[in-house]
A protein has these predicted regions:
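Flexible mid-to-C-terminal extensions adjoining Fe-S/redox cofactors in radical SAM and related proteins
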Residues: 1-17, 37, 41, 269, ...
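N-terminal active-site segment of His-dependent metallophosphoesterases
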Residues: 34-59
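Radical SAM/AdoMet-radical enzyme domain recognition
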Residues: 52-73, 82-175, 179-183
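Conserved C-terminal portion of the radical SAM core fold
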Residues: 132-248
Length: 326
């Protein structure tokens, strides 16, 4: 299939900047499919004051590019373990049109979520089969719905522990509230050098791949802050016409070569690593002078225009979700 373009169905989302920020690499899990550098506590948590300065600089730059709304996705490690996490969220929420989404394993006690969930627009749970207590996740997600906060669970599907993963899915489906979503997520092999060529999909069978074709349970958004400007549903333009585009479908079908495409990585999405270094997109490794690889507490320049992709493989779901055109 020849794809000419992928873009958001709702044009308002083109005026939204998505910031993925790894606050540190401290985690209370030690998953077999996760690189040690992502959970071994080898980098300190971010400095709160430096981060506030960066946040101000970011708003000033991107507002001049026509960005009106900002989605902050905080990961780790486990971001909720950061001692200043709540204060960081409060500072961001003091500015208009900011939406915070922790990417979390959900292991914090229920009372923590009951107290602090008011700071979040939504919560994305990474469900790790080797450590998760699925009944606890159900209790947390049900409570978030009662607080009118959207959530979705991404279940990491290990092909060699498939039955355990399916058992977890069944526990999640048996929740009191059905508005929060459940999505099976394909895993990629741990890579040594962080090059796109090494990010190969786990060896799923054709039957196993079927679970990635559609959400297990679609998310029914209930947050009063939700509107079309925050809907990132996508379409693609092909030789056969206009069709819906699902990034999970693209990755599982090895539609990962976007080289030569104009891509909005850096304009629509940026990533900040646990070492404070910034990148375009999320896992994107396209170079951009005076931005890519720079630390956010040093001198740098934010991107000002789309880039031309020169990578042969783009397998990070978040990067695939960035608009692209030939």
């Amino acid at each position: 299939m020849l794809i000419e373009k992928i873009d958001y169905k709702f044009k308002e989302f083109n005026r939204v900047l998505q910031i993925e920020w790894t606050l540190g690499n401290t985690c209370n899990y030690n998953c077999s499919y996760c690189l040690p550098i992502l959970h071994n506590n080898s980098f300190p948590w971010i400095n709160l004051d430096e981060s506030k300065t960066f946040i101000d600089k970011l708003h000033n730059h991107y507002s001049k590019l026509g960005i009106t709304d900002y989605i902050w996705k905080f990961g780790g490690g486990e971001p909720t373990l950061y001692k200043d996490f709540v204060e960081l969220c409060v500072y961001i929420n003091s500015k208009p049109n900011n939406y915070i989404i922790p990417i979390t394993n959900g292991s914090r006690k229920l009372h923590w979520w009951q107290e602090h969930a008011k700071n979040f627009f939504a919560v994305h749970f990474s469900i790790h089969p080797e450590f998760v207590d699925p009944n606890h996740i159900v209790a947390v997600c049900d409570n978030l719905i009662e607080q009118k906060i959207d959530s979705i669970c991404h279940v990491m599907m290990k092909p060699n522990d498939w039955n355990r993963c399916l058992e977890i899915v069944e526990v999640l489906k048996n929740s009191q509230h059905k508005q929060w979503g459940i999505q099976a997520k394909p895993l990629h092999h741990t890579w040594e050098l962080d090059t796109a060529e090494e990010r190969d999909l786990y060896p799923y069978t054709a039957e196993q791949k079927q679970i990635f074709q559609a959400p297990i349970r679609a998310q029914n958004r209930i947050s009063p802050r939700v509107d079309s400007k925050l809907n990132r549903d996508m379409y693609m333009v092909t030789e056969e016409g206009i069709k819906d585009f699902d990034p999970y479908w693209a990755v599982t079908h090895d539609i990962v070569d976007w080289s030569g495409f104009k891509c909005d990585a850096g304009i629509n999405r940026i990533y900040i690593n646990y070492d404070k270094r910034m990148y375009l997109g999320a896992g994107c490794r396209v170079e951009l002078n005076n931005f890519v690889g720079k630390k956010y507490n040093e001198e740098f320049e934010f991107p000002t225009k789309s880039i031309i992709c020169n990578q042969r493989r783009c397998v990070c779901i978040a990067d695939v979700q960035v608009p692209k055109s030939r």
